[in-house]
Amino acid sequence: MEVLQQLGTYYSQNGGYVLQEFYRHFLMSVYGVLFAAIVGIPLGILIARYRRLSGWVFAVTNVIQTIPALAMLAVLMLVMGLGANTVILSLFLYSLLPIIRNTYTGIISIEHAYLESGKAMGMTKFQVLRMVELPLALSVIMAGLRTALVIAIGITAIGTFVGAGGLGDIIVRGSNATNGTAIILAGAIPTALMAVIADLVMGWLERALSPIKKKKGNFIIADRKTTSI
């Protein structure tokens, strides 16, 4: 109970600071994933077209995933210095694998009949991609973005070690303080809530964008232009 009282007191006295760091934490996470999506989605489409490249691309992105986050930040800090940009670049690198993998999987798993129908209607390769493949693969791509964002929120918490701020800054302050359990919780609880809410929202978007929806025990094709081909 004493810890809860201390936690409530901390929030009442430092609510503005916590909100500021929450916002900063969220923005860094989103920027890292957004930049990874800008690169990763086209790259996933490319290796779905030229599958010989997939082994090399996945090998590189898998190696990146094996590097501890703190070590990655330390290396990038030597190049980019302290600050949020170092964290965003780190998040960009860690977010590539789930985004590329899900884009690749979503594209190659589309039934060949849909592609042939598009070609039979006189669509160009780009039109087939834009009007058939991407809409049908969108829910799978969203699943990759969902995974990447949740991972990014967790990694951003250690960005405080390179001067990036965020909720990790509150956690570190608590770990350095005497009887700082309440301060640690003041940073850890919003971080966990952010990850849970992001996962729920992205999960809802993933289901909403799925071309196959479940209704009354039966699977039906969603009402989408691409599925009418």
From Swiss-Prot:
One of its GO terms (biological process) is amino acid transport. Residues 22-202 form the ABC transmembrane type-1 domain. It is found in: Cell membrane. SUPFAM superfamilies: MetI-like. Keywords: Amino-acid transport, Cell membrane, Membrane, Transmembrane, Transmembrane helix, Transport. It is a multi-pass membrane protein. It holds the Pfam family BPD_transp_1. The keyword Transport applies. The keyword Transit peptide does not apply. Gene3D superfamilies: MetI-like. CDD domains: TM_PBP2. It comes from the Bacteria. The chain crosses the membrane at residues 27-47, 55-74, 78-100, 148-168, 182-202. InterPro entries: ABC_transp_perm/SBD, MetI-like, MetI-like_sf. The complex is composed of two ATP-binding proteins (OpuCA), two transmembrane proteins (OpuCB and OpuCD) and a solute-binding protein (OpuCC). Belongs to the binding-protein-dependent transport system permease family. CysTW subfamily. Involved in a high affinity multicomponent binding-protein-dependent transport system for glycine betaine, carnitine and choline; probably responsible for the translocation of the substrate across the membrane. This is Glycine betaine/carnitine/choline transport system permease protein OpuCD. It comes from Bacillus subtilis (strain 168). The gene is opuCD.
